[in-house]
Amino acid sequence: MSTTDTIVAQATPPGRGGVGILRISGRGAKDVAQALLGKLPKPRYADYLPFRDAAGATLDQGIALWFPGPNSFTGEDVLELQGHGGPVILDLLLKRVLALPGMRIARPGEFSERAFLNDKLDLAQAEAIADLIDASSEQAARSAMNSLQGAFSTRIHQLVEALTHLRIYVEAAIDFPDEEIDFLSDGKIEAQLNGVMADLDSVRAEARQGSLLREGMKVVIAGRPNAGKSSLLNALAGREAAIVTDIAGTTRDVLREHIHIDGMPLHIIDTAGLREASDEVERIGIERAWNEIEQADRVLFMVDGTTTAATEPAEIWPEFMARLPHRLPITVVRNKADITGETLGMTEVNGHSLIRLSARTGEGIDLLRDHLKQSMGFTSNMEGGFLARRRHLQALEQAAQHLVEGKEQLVSAYAGELLAEELRLAQQALSEITGEFTSDDLLGRIFSSFCIGK
């Protein structure tokens, strides 16, 4: 669709409410004001007046706000009509606006898209609007606001600027090879490159934490039947989310609970006990359990402490460990400490964390919560933090890889042309985050996930 049309959409959620808002953006916004209000309101002042139909009858009365472009959210002329929040009233107002020439309903996210296209905000800031609306915790909301205010974008621009300066030196070394000082071999370019790589690593670490805050950490509870997996799910969730009995194989399907630990979102998944299936239903449940394990960020390997004194995972269940995806982090949870009399606490066993607790009594659960936070590098103090999406992490990873390859070309062969190309590609990958180098297809996918009125 054309981005020069005048668009309209309801900016408040559907349903009944005290206030309902229509947002209009585009060259025809002033025509809407003249038609419904009889005048053009004073810019950026609230004006209380009737909203009229084509015959001059009052449809509603409320507040009109007029923002002439380019000093508006979208960079275009914008009119907001704030009336009563009844569905019928809003529908009448919407039909009235759409009856005027050149008006159409906005696509999802089109207001934010126009703001991006008119350089009112970059792509990372536009995405932060949707993240702010979807925030599931106070910390996520604060980090989304930081992103909206440019915290993430500023870090990216600093990296791009540093790469620009570095490219200048490299291009100079290529263009003037006969100069007395060889910039490629005197160590200065390598030192600058190392500095950029260190800064990029810092941003990547913050972005991973921002992604964790946005997406949540997927933790799968796995183990043999009757190890206490469902009891642990209930203890972490703080409610009876799963049925708990002494009958082996009670849990036959995947159970999911979404919880927060000091603002960190976690997706806790209880799975069927892993063993040789006794019937088709149990076989399907075990297959689903392994599917969840393979997609997990961390596995809590539940062990019934009354059945073994072993603490080494490979000794407890070698077949289970052999099937786990490579490098998938696991935490061994020795359950039923209230029965075995084991001392509660956490230790390290051959690179794996081991926690002794009682899911039934709740003893040791707080220790597990702290461990889950620490294992993902999460801190409750993220005042300057920002949210990040998977595409951001991918772009940062691509940029880092290009810098690694560029350094290899510099150190091994002083290949200036190849280094310059890797620097350019790294810069392009970073610019995709803010939207300076982004395909139209990607823009369409990003903004289509927004609300209609945003």
Swiss-Prot record:
Signal peptide coordinates: none
Specify which residues bind Mg(2+) according to the UniProt entry for this protein: 230, 251
Cofactor(s) for this protein? K(+)
Q: Which residues bind GTP?
A: 226-231, 245-251, 270-273, 335-338, 358-360
GO molecular function term, any single one: GTPase activity
The UniProt record lists the keyword Nucleotide-binding: yes
Where would I find the TrmE-type G domain in this sequence? Answer: 216-377
**Example of a GO biological process term:** tRNA wobble uridine modification
| CDD domains recorded | trmE, TrmE_N
Keyword annotations for this protein?
Cytoplasm, GTP-binding, Hydrolase, Magnesium, Metal-binding, Nucleotide-binding, Potassium, tRNA processing
Task: Provide the E.C. number(s) assigned to this enzyme.
Answer: 3.6.-.-
Give the multimer and partner information.
Homodimer. Heterotetramer of two MnmE and two MnmG subunits.
Could you tell me what this protein does? Exhibits a very high intrinsic GTPase hydrolysis rate. Involved in the addition of a carboxymethylaminomethyl (cmnm) group at the wobble position (U34) of certain tRNAs, forming tRNA-cmnm(5)s(2)U34.
HAMAP family in the cross-refs? GTPase_MnmE
For this chain, the family text in UniProt reads: Belongs to the TRAFAC class TrmE-Era-EngA-EngB-Septin-like GTPase superfamily. TrmE GTPase family.
Q: Could you tell me what this protein is called?
A: tRNA modification GTPase MnmE
State the organism named in the record.
Answer: Serratia proteamaculans (strain 568)
